[in-house]
Amino acid sequence: MKDKRKIQQLKLEQNQKKLRSQKQDLKQNKGKSKKDRSGLLDLIFRKEPKRYTVEDTIPYLRLLKSGICQIDEKHFNKSIAFEDINYQLALEEDRDLIFNQFANFLNSFDPSISIEFSYINQLGRNEEMKSAIQIPDKKDGFDDIRLEFREMLKSQIVKGNNGLKKSKYVTFTVEADNLEQATSKLERLEIDILSSLKSMGVRAESLNGEERLKVLHDVLNPNKTFEFSYKNLKKKESTKTYIAPDEFNFTPSRYFKFGKFIGAASHFQILASELSDRMLAEFLDIDDNINISFHIKAIEQSEAIKMVKRKNTDIDKMKIEENKKAVRSGYDMDILPSDLITYGEDVKSLLKDLQTRDERMFVVTIIFMNFAKTIQKLDNTISQISSIANKHNCKLKRLDHSQEQGLISVLPLGVNKIEIDRGLTSSSTAVFMPFTTEELFINSANSLYYGLNALSHNLIMADRKRLKNPNGLILGTPGSGKSFSAKREMANAILTTDDDVIICDPEGEYGNLVRQFKGEVIKVSSKSKDYLNPLDINMNYGDGDAPLKDKANFIMSMLELVVGGSGLTAEEKSVIDRCLPKIYEKYFENPKPCNMPILQNLYDMLKNQEEKVGKKLATEMEIYVTGSLNVFNHQSNVDLNKQLLCFDIKELGSQLKKIGMLVIQDQVWNKVSQNRGNKATRYYIDEFHLLLKDEQTASYSVEIWKRFRKWGGIPTGITQNVKDLLMSKEIENIFDNTDFVLMLNQASGDREILARKLKISQPQLKYVTNSNAGEGLLFFGNTIVPFLDKFPKDTILYQKMTTKPEEVR
């Protein structure tokens, strides 16, 4: 502020000198007319606007709660924040489509509208990321692991982009006589812009006043927390008070000071005849503080064509002059300077584009602003940007003596104070593609960690409960990290949420993790003393309206496996349906565990039926009731109320495997019914392809995939045998009801099948081709993100999750 006062004092002294000089001139011109003297007096005493405070640098009159900003008496604007989409990894035809859609989006703005695209990268501004990794303690005996998990997430952020926050905004400005007229124009424009972005698959939302002020505050105060509410705004108080830094000092010609930071504004000069659509992405990939603004204004089409025609005429004149020179000098008049020929061809091509190819002309100004705490650090970043610019045959030129104007022009306020522009067509402007790779970061209490984005190195945090179909698949070759990824999600869910987690474990490899979290490992085999009753039911079973009816469907599926062949006849189904209400009668009258029927009760009831088919069914059931496979003819004696349950079926044997897996699925359905409306139930099925091989288990699995989500169930199939999985008749139903796929390294044949099935592009496919463990593609709804996860090996969780014997300590 002292510097400001000194500057003001200096200006005052200069004005006083000018005044004395003007008075002297007045004395010397006494003979002039009154009119002349009056004009001179007006000149002397005319008041020039002066900047007295830091707020005067911020170029707006008022920013309303609605998000409308009034720049001056005639100009008003709004801002929209938009997210990234997959462009760099998309299929070639999809990239072309996105490019054309973006060019058409630019074409939709007429000359009365000014557009500013703002791209803001800021270090240390990712509050969302910080809050997402704050897993609260629960005092359940696992808080030491929660602490370890939080530290792991912090270390992953450091390995990645160090908490760099990347934001994208489009600010659109209109001219209007008053606020009412401006509001009407801006609202119509806002709807059109949101609709255009949505058609490109871009998530976008309009910013209200508070959100716009926060964006401005964070640019102008990189190390401060934004604290503002329109409720606390005093009458006649400006919102600028809450976003202005402590000071601005624009005295140096090449830098400026704001608060504790040093900034530098530069103009981006395009020298190349052709540009790459990767260039903007390369600038935004720099892990440092960068602000880039594109000010774009359309030129009236007829005026643009006239302008190009004039250029063409000028070139023709130059050619005639060159011809005359050639004749005078005695050489061939058809030989023209190569630059003139090239320039002429370019102008003709441009004219053709404007007249026949739906191209439009835009006036574009590109401003960069960087800041740091030291000049050395600032210069290093600017040097990085300059290197990229030079690589693309462009230049970054410092705005000497115009740093204040540069800063104003880079703020997302739609104000451009730099009168250096370049004429570009729609296609040339669209080359500055704002899209690179889609991020996946959902700030939710239920969000889980899935690694780092392989392109941007941003943390991937996602909540499957937000998906339309949270059902999932984890696919990968042996050694790709398939089981580890599943275990990491299970552990994360237990640490972060109250969800129940159930595992169907055909290889006995999840026991360590289950015991770490004091869960229950239930060994299901003919030798085991852990018993599951396939006739277990609760009052919420199935849809809850008719639990016995839903249970009957399961029992018939199980008996179809028992009888084999073509399954149950209509007569057999009728007999079973008649018996079931009778064996459950005692339980429904007094729902105690001891009154729950077992297979023996159904066996006895069938044996006593008059029809021969009843006795036939009883005979076919006999081995499972009184014979050697009677493991399922007992009351359940295991604790099914633990948060983490694991059904270990490694020793189940081939004769019992199908029935065993069906019984487990029914126990899971029981759990989902019981938890309905209270908490989610996550069900992980390893070697999932085995369930889809048999008609009954496949049919029951599809029912789970279709109906679980309604009651808070989240099933996940895990397999390494993609070919077997895709051979199932039911795979279409599985894929149609799956919005989450975690795909790790794939064998070549499987890779090709999945590429066709999931429409994976060649650039995306490389992330599942000979990739390292823990690397692959994550499909989350319509989002596809390449990921990598290097989980720290020196952690308790890693020891419990790894399947490599040499790593277990």
Model-derived regions: residue spans:
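Hydrophobic positions on the alpha1 helix immediately C-terminal to the Walker A/P-loop
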Residues: 485
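Post-Walker A helix-loop "phosphate-sensing" segment adjacent to the P-loop in P-loop NTPases
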Residues: 492-502
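Conserved P-loop NTPase
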Residues: 758-809
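Hydrophobic anchor at the beta1->P-loop junction of P-loop NTPases
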Residues: 474
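Conserved lysine of the Walker
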Residues: 482
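A short helix-turn-beta junction within AAA+ P-loop NTPase domains corresponding to the substrate/partner-engaging
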Residues: 518-522, 730-743
